[in-house]
A protein has these predicted regions:
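Segments that shape or occlude catalytic/ligand-binding pockets
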Residues: 1
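A gly/proline- and charged-residue-enriched helix-loop-helix capping module
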Residues: 10-48
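Active-site loop segments of alpha/beta catalytic cores
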Residues: 34-177
Length: 177
């Protein structure tokens, strides 16, 4: 639903404009359509590469990165302060769609699924907001994502997400032999 500037040889893809000015508008956006457009072409490319014996790493963006294309960040921060119950619904609306996408990536043969939300780091959100998001969304969301991991599919987490989970004691480092 976002307006995307695909970029050029100097700068890559980025938001071209916002489609929402209030966080409640996000709840009225249609679900992602995985059956057409670039998203479908990417899934088909994944399938073809796996059929040819290649390993496929699929990067999946988290809710803050997606929101960064849909709405100005100041409205997101305002919503988190003044409308936390709406923001929880927004996170889960996006989270459910992200999870569906990850399920499709697995179905199409993606064997490494990388989850990153660079716009949702502690350096942007601050420690208090980061902790709230990690406890109320990121951790429960990733518990659902964890179900996708098996002997054919590995889930990779970006360092910011990993450190947020460790910092809130929702995860710990474990040595594997």
């Amino acid at each position: 639903g976002g307006i995307i500037n695909l970029g050029n040889e100097i700068a890559g893809p980025r938001a071209g404009g916002y489609v929402c000015t209030d966080v409640e508008e996000i709840l009225n956006l249609p679900d992602m359509d995985f059956t057409k457009g670039r998203i479908q072409e990417t899934l088909l490319a994944c399938k073809k590469l796996r059929e040819e014996g290649e390993h496929v790493v699929f990067e999946v963006a988290g809710p803050f990165t997606i929101l960064n294309v849909l709405i100005d960040a100041r409205y997101v921060f305002k919503g988190m302060r003044k409308k936390p119950e709406v923001m929880e619904k927004v996170f889960w609306k996006l989270g459910d769609q992200i999870l569906k996408y990850m399920e499709l990536v697995k179905e199409y043969g993606g064997d490494l699924i990388s989850y990153a939300d660079s716009s949702g780091g502690v350096n942007i959100l601050g420690p208090k907001m980061m902790e709230a998001v990690t406890v109320n969304f990121t951790y429960p969301f990733l518990k659902k994502v964890e179900q996708l991991a098996d002997d054919k599919t590995m889930i990779l987490l970006c360092p910011k997400t990993t450190l947020a989970l460790i910092g809130t004691e929702k995860a710990k480092f474990v040595d594997h032999q």
